[in-house]
Amino acid sequence: MARKGQKETEKTRRRILASALTLFAKKGYDRTTFTDIAARLDMTKGAVYWHFESKQALLMALIDEMLQKFGRQIAALLPQGETSFDGLSFPVVADMMVRNAAQIICDAKGTAFFLLIHEQIKWADASMAKIREDLLTNHRFGPWSAFRKAVENGIRSGSVRTDVDPAQVATVCVSIWDGLVHSRIAHVLQCDLEDTLRKSYDAVWKSITAAERVPPAQ
């Protein structure tokens, strides 16, 4: 009975998170209340509070859940025989990220999360400081770590210059991905998403390589 109760609790928690994501993306974080979230699920506001002590706690849980989901999607794109990002090269990681971008734009929850993060939260507000810091420093998100490790691998193998900062390159690469995916979701990108990502990563790769002639990142 206890196990059944735990499953029901987790199921309800996930329903609340899904409802919150939909409403946050459509109405905005500030304009959405616990009453709105509860009404959409035919629940009481108190029931929502039982799972999340505040709207901020709910948002943090939602961000964590979505980052974990994106991380699982990236892990599923690992080359056959690989179980981690540790031994991957930059071109391989770049290819994984391009394919993941194609997955994201076809995923309703993924697109809703992007709209929420980019358009429906006032990050400058003081109340958002803790969440903003957690999101910006959350290196659990697989792509950042994958790009960093790939650059470090390149430096060790001699294919990447020794003066290159792996963390800096990782930040640039994730920012490219984030910006182009959001532009595609917002219908403002006037070129092919996958082709543009590949060419962008190819440019980054060429800028950090030690040799003059190297295979493109594809």
Segments (PLM) and residue ranges:
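Helix-turn-helix
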Residues: K4, K11, R15, S19-E65
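Residues at secondary-structure transition points
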Residues: R3, K7, K11, E53, ...
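Amphipathic C-terminal alpha-helical segment
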Residues: Q103-D107, W123-A124, W144, K149, ...
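Hydrophobic alpha-helical connector segments
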Residues: A61, A75-A112, P166-C173, R213-Q218
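Hydrophobic/aromatic residues within well-ordered alpha-helical segments
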Residues: K55, L62, M66, F70, ...
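Amphipathic alpha-helical segments used for helix-helix packing
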Residues: I104-D134, H182
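Amphipathic alpha-helical packing segments from all-alpha helical-bundle domains
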Residues: A75, L88, V92, A112, ...
